[in-house]
Amino acid sequence: SLLBFKBMIEST
């Protein structure tokens, strides 16, 4: 899912 993808990338 895109949301999961974004969350994974922006995992600060």
From Swiss-Prot:
Places the protein is found: Secreted
Q: Which GO terms describe its biological process?
A: lipid catabolic process
Coiled-coil stretches noted in the UniProt entry, renumbered to this chain? none
Secreted is among the record's keywords: yes
What Gene Ontology molecular function terms does this protein carry? phospholipase A2 activity
Q: In which tissues is it expressed?
A: Expressed by the venom gland.
Name where it mostly resides: secreted
What keywords appear on the UniProt entry?
Calcium, Hydrolase, Lipid degradation, Lipid metabolism, Secreted
Reactions mediated catalytically: a 1,2-diacyl-sn-glycero-3-phosphocholine + H2O = a 1-acyl-sn-glycero-3-phosphocholine + a fatty acid + H(+)
* Enzyme Commission identifier(s): 3.1.1.4
Relay the cofactor remark from the entry. Binds 1 Ca(2+) ion.
Q: Which cofactor does it need?
A: Ca(2+)
| A GO cellular component annotation in the UniProt record | extracellular region
* Summary of the function given for this chain in its UniProt record: PLA2 catalyzes the calcium-dependent hydrolysis of the 2-acyl groups in 3-sn-phosphoglycerides.
**Similarity comment:** Belongs to the phospholipase A2 family. Group I subfamily.
Protein name stated in the entry: Phospholipase A2 1
Origin species = Micrurus tener microgalbineus
